[in-house]
């Protein structure tokens, strides 16, 4: 399933798991889960509300990083690297045989330069607000903000002064269908 720039989509998988897909996202999933695991592949950003099944763990694969859950809610973003933010429950991030457990209100980020998964405590709201039609930015670089806005509104952004990309901003915006409604 491929969601284009400026789009969003939600679906319920065969096991009852609900998935919200953000703009420029691809989700590969089977029509029906067979075997001992429920496995999907993700590129982009998705929010998962995973149906509990202790006998059949749910796995999200992104390259050689796997997030494993038994029933929980989390956001996964692969636009720039692999980032998982846990809302409720417990998940593990696995890469190259290394496993890191996340607790609610924690973010795990795979750092390919170090081959490590880094964990930090976060406010989950800015990471999941997109699912409810909002953008929330907290001390975020203008470059990162414009990346998100360009994915949603299908914009191409050019900077005459590249130093502006590093300016940090905070604020809340509603996600409108037309960028003109922002101004």
Give short role names for the model-derived ranges.
Residues 1-183:
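A residue-level detector for the "anchor" residue at the start of short, highly conserved motifs
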């Amino acid at each position: 399933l491929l969601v284009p720039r400026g789009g969003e989509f939600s679906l319920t998988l065969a096991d009852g798991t609900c998935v919200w897909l953000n703009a420029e996202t691809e989700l590969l999933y089977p029509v029906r889960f067979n075997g001992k695991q429920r496995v999907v592949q993700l590129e982009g950003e998705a929010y998962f509300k995973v149906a509990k099944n202790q006998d059949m763990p749910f796995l999200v694969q992104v390259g050689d990083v796997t997030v494993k859950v038994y029933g929980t809610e989390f956001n996964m973003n692969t636009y720039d690297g692999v980032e998982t933010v846990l809302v409720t429950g417990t998940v593990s991030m696995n890469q190259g045989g290394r496993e890191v457990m996340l607790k609610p209100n924690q973010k795990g980020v795979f750092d390919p330069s170090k081959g490590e998964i880094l964990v930090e405590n976060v406010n989950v709201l800015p990471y999941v607000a997109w699912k409810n039609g909002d953008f929330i930015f907290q001390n975020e670089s203008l470059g990162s903000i414009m990346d998100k806005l360009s994915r949603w509104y299908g914009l191409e952004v050019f900077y005459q002064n590249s130093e502006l990309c590093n300016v940090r901003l905070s604020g809340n915006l509603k996600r409108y269908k037309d960028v003109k409604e922002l101004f």
